[in-house]
């Protein structure tokens, strides 16, 4: 079914997200003349018109601030469009009318406001029982870590560099061989920005709760450059220090020792798959044996280890994915994260027009991973969703008891301010009592980042003061 949506509101992009979630059963066609959905908003009323039928619903927003009124009207418009498409296609989506990244954040907010969040998700947002149960379980598992504290901050350092580009990746990451002339200046500037941020922490009188070094692949750096950044961060006192070591072909014993000597508590070793044919296909320059070798080497140190896998990688069958899940479980890391492939703009898979919407396969893969991982002593502790995901499902992080990642919970629930360093890094300032946050983004390109050092430091200082 081809469809066109017309609205008098500013919510068209959000409404398009609902339509895309029903792909391939529904497709957007701006030239469509027959199947046109009109969504009109007039004060507190949302009207949906389709095939000479009109449905109107009022939104109780009179006593809400303007930004909240807008949010509630948008939510109602999405629900009404979802109901129409569900009726036309006979399909119900795993998370109902929800299209946002952070369903657990909304669940927490509703609970904290005194509402029955689970009932709201099921009855109003049209989330099926299984989806509502899953969100509730994750929120319950965050107890003891989930908190609001404006006197604590997280640190994030971005190393947007990789040895090569994976076919599914859309991050603004540079290939190591193409930016060698900028490496030393970049490392130096990141170290200076970290020092500036530590001074800012002291001025603000706050504590650092966790540190997360991501990218890209931070371990793409040589040992000398890598140590400069990790050693500077190692001077900071915090509860948790994670490095996204990532690709096995970038991890050496010396880098593991650098991390251990400087207080890193948690690393990621990310296979994505344990199938050699897929590793080659997606542009990973290592084999499954390399994964095993690096994992055993990392176990000589006292790190908690996370392993990422991706469901619906190109040409992978259910049995291929099952094999990867079983291999990860057998290695017995503290965390396993299951991503559902999202075809993102800027990725090679998007350019190749790879189809990740094979009927029922994503659901089968994710259901298996849930059951297998949980039955082996893990619990889901955070989740997030993205556009263009296979099966409109989710990414879920699992942890053994008392091994959940603080930073992952903080960033997904947006409960703590984040001081971010490096090209493309985004700082966040959270005002818990006002339920408000603001963002400050560093320039994405390494070259631009290097050109604007003084402005970056000044902007950050003004942002947090």
Model-identified regions with their sequence ranges:
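Beta-strand scaffold of nucleotide-dependent catalytic cores
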Residues: 158, 268, 335-339, 409, ...
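Conserved non-cysteine loop/helix-boundary elements of the Radical SAM core domain that shape
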Residues: 173-368
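Radical SAM enzyme core and accessory elements
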Residues: 1-105, 109-113, 117, 397, ...
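N-terminal [4Fe-4S]-dependent radical SAM core
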Residues: 88-95, 112-156, 204
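Canonical Radical SAM [4Fe-4S] cluster-binding loop centered on the CxxxCxxC motif
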Residues: 150-187
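Beta-sheet entry/capping signal
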Residues: 152-154, 210, 240, 335, ...
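Short beta-strand motif preference
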Residues: 46-48, 157, 269
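A C-terminal junction/extension of Radical SAM enzymes
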Residues: 28-34, 346-421
């Amino acid at each position: 079914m081809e469809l066109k949506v017309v609205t008098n509101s500013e919510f068209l992009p959000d409404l398009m997200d609902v339509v895309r979630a029903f792909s391939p059963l529904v497709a957007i066609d701006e030239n469509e003349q027959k199947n046109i959905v009109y969504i009109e908003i007039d004060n507190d009323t949302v009207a949906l018109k389709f095939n000479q039928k009109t449905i109107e619903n009022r939104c109780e927003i009179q006593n809400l601030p303007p930004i909240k009124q807008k949010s509630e009207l948008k939510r109602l418009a999405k629900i009404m469009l979802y109901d129409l498409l569900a009726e036309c296609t006979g399909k119900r989506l795993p998370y109902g009318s929800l299209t946002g990244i952070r369903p657990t954040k909304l669940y927490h907010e509703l609970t904290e406001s005194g509402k029955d969040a689970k009932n709201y998700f099921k009855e109003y947002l049209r989330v099926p029982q299984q989806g509502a149960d899953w969100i509730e379980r994750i929120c319950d598992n965050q107890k003891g870590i989930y908190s609001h504290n404006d006197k604590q901050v997280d640190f994030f350092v971005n190393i947007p560099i990789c040895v090569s580009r994976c076919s599914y990746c859309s991050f603004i990451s540079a290939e190591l061989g193409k930016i060698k002339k900028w490496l030393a200046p970049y490392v130096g500037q990141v170290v200076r920005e970290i020092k500036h941020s530590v001074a800012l922490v002291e001025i603000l009188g706050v504590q650092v709760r966790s540190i997360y070094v991501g990218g890209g692949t931070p371990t793409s750096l040589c040992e000398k450059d890598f140590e400069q950044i990790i050693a500077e961060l190692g001077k900071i006192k915090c509860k948790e220090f994670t490095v996204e070591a990532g690709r096995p072909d970038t991890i050496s014993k010396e880098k593991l020792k650098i991390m251990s000597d400087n207080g890193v508590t948690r690393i990621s070793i990310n296979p994505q798959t344990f199938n050699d044919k897929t590793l080659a296909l997606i542009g990973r320059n290592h084999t499954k044996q390399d994964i095993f070798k690096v994992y055993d080497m990392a176990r000589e140190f006292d790190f908690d280890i996370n392993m990422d896998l991706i469901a619906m990688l190109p040409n992978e069958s259910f049995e291929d994915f099952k094999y990867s899940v079983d291999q990860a479980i057998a290695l017995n890391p503290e965390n396993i994260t299951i991503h559902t492939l999202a075809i993102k703009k800027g990725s090679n898979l998007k350019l190749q027009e790879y189809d990740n919407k094979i009927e029922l396969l994503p659901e089968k893969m994710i259901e298996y991973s849930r059951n297998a991982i949980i039955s082996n002593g893990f619990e889901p502790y955070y989740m997030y969703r993205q556009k263009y995901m296979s099966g409109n499902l989710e990414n879920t992080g699992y942890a053994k008891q008392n091994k959940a990642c603080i930073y992952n919970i903080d960033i997904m629930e947006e409960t703590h301010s984040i001081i971010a360093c490096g090209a493309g890094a985004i700082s966040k300032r959270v005002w818990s009592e006002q339920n408000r946050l603001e963002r400050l983004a560093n320039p994405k390109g390494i070259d631009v980042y290097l050109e604007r050092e003084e402005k970056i430091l000044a902007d950050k200082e003004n942002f947090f003061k």
